[in-house]
Regions:
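Hydrophobic helix-and-loop "lid/oligomerization" segment in the mid-to-C-terminal part
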Residues: 1-111, 116-147
Length: 147
């Protein structure tokens, strides 16, 4: 199929960029800030990042500007699970989970009242960011040791 696009002069790279790669300046700023503030835990098997309401206000970001950040965390070398907390209220977080190989994040999300599938899931949780992460990593550890 690719040679046909090339022969017909269709600018397929332009469409790939526009559909999958381009982001707004706000999205780029929010991504950069989130990646810089991320941390690895569990001997580097898990990466965690938080997007606060203050960050969202500072960058004048909308909820849709967060899209794709969890995937950038997930592709970090050596990481099995990525956790992204998005603060939506006082001590309330929308949690996104992504897995690379053997951790079933849908089981974790289901335990906390959310849903998804094996490699991508989410839920909402109340508590401090630290407490939320501690609750989640306990479930990740139990799957790691029982694989």
């Amino acid at each position: 199929a690719l040679p046909i696009f090339i022969e017909t002069g269709i600018p397929f790279w332009k469409y790939i960029d526009e559909c999958f790669l381009q982001r707004t300046y706000t999205q780029t700023q929010l991504l950069g800030r989130t990646l810089l503030a991320s941390m690895r835990v569990m001997d580097g098997k898990c990466i965690v990042a938080t997007i606060t309401r203050r960050m969202m206000e500072f960058y004048e970001a909308k909820t849709e500007d967060i899209e794709g950040i969890i995937d950038q965390l997930r592709i970090t070398q050596g990481v099995e699970v990525a956790i992204l907390l998005h603060e939506i209220g006082d001590q309330e977080y929308k949690v996104s989970l992504r897995s690379n190989n053997y951790i079933d994040v849908s089981k974790i999300a289901s335990f906390f009242g959310g849903g998804g599938h094996v490699k991508a899931a989410g839920f909402t949780m109340r508590g401090s960011a630290h407490d939320v992460v501690n609750n989640i990593t306990g479930h990740i550890e139990s799957q790691m040791f029982n694989k």
